[in-house]
Design a protein with these regions (language model features):
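Conserved ABC ATPase signature
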Residues: 127-131
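The feature captures the beta-strand-to-loop junction immediately N-terminal to the Walker
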Residues: 30-32
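H-loop/switch region of ABC-family ATPase nucleotide-binding domains
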Residues: 194-195
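H-loop (His-switch) and adjacent beta-strand-loop-beta switch element
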Residues: 207-222
């Protein structure tokens, strides 16, 4: 078990919720705006304290120092572009600073693979202030993935992403999910807040459905994301259809 969260809470934004996360598991937090998704993810990072306890690899988050946490997990928060000006390659290099000395060939190999996956290899010589919103988000995603990339950081266990698909178009979003699945297949547990419910239905191994700070359901996507539960939570009409052997959600209001 990678994460064991017991009665995690930060009232009134998040009421007590308990769950566990296994190695290689992709967990999606879904729910309306203000339901507690970002709060839950921030508390899993160990940077924000509330009530309850989160254990990472059987040890309380509060017993780790920041340097140790940086090697075990990466937290990609929602944030605007920083005020400083730096090149994309330099920015990505900063993501590896917590890992100490690394083999240059291994770094270049990982950098090539991640940048190719997110289609930002041609952006490495650009300044981050010159990037579009979608380009900047992909650079941030690349930096987060590099921090916990298994060949560079064998201690890494957890990737926390708060609405990582923000500003991405459908092609870029597809590339992101492919990269996330690749990391999960290497044993990295991934927790992310998400608004694309069809993606959650297809991509998540486990779902936590939040509403008004409460976890109203958790489990497999097919069990949690029923028409009745989604209509009640999002206050809109939902239809579930089958297309090419896959379930799809239609929002008809």
């Amino acid at each position: 078990m990678i994460v064991d969260a017991k009665n995690l809470a930060m009232p009134p934004r998040l009421l007590p919720v308990s769950f566990s996360i296994e190695a290689g598991e992709i967990v999606h937090l879904i729910g309306p705006n203000g339901s507690g998704k970002s709060t839950a993810i921030s508390m899993l990072s160990g940077l924000f304290q509330g009530e309850g306890e989160v254990q990472l690899l059987g040890k309380s988050l509060q017993d780790y120092d920041l340097q140790s946490l940086a090697r075990l997990r990466c937290y990609l928060a929602q944030q605007d572009r920083p005020a400083f000006s730096v090149g994309v390659y330099h920015y990505l290099s900063l993501a590896l600073s917590a890992l100490g000395e690394l083999d240059a060939d291994s770094v270049q190999s990982a950098l090539d693979e991640v940048c190719s996956a997110l289609n930002i290899a041609d952006k490495l010589t650009r300044n981050i202030q010159q990037l579009s919103g979608g380009e900047w988000q992909r650079v941030r995603l690349a930096a987060a993935c590099l921090q916990v990339w298994p060949t560079l950081n064998p201690e890494a266990r957890l990737l926390l992403l708060d609405e990582p698909a923000a500003a991405l178009d459908i092609g870029q979003e597809a590339a992101m999910y492919k990269l996330i699945r690749m990391m999960a297949e290497q044993g990295i547990a991934v927790v992310m807040a998400n608004h694309d419910l069809n993606r959650t239905l297809r991509e998540a191994d486990k779902v936590l459905l939040l509403n008004n700070g409460s976890c109203v359901a958790k489990g497999k996507p097919s069990d949690v994301m029923t028409v009745e539960m989604l209509e009640s939570t999002f206050v809109t009409r939902v239809q579930r259809i089958e297309h090419d052997g896959k379930s799809c959600l239609l929002f008809v209001d």
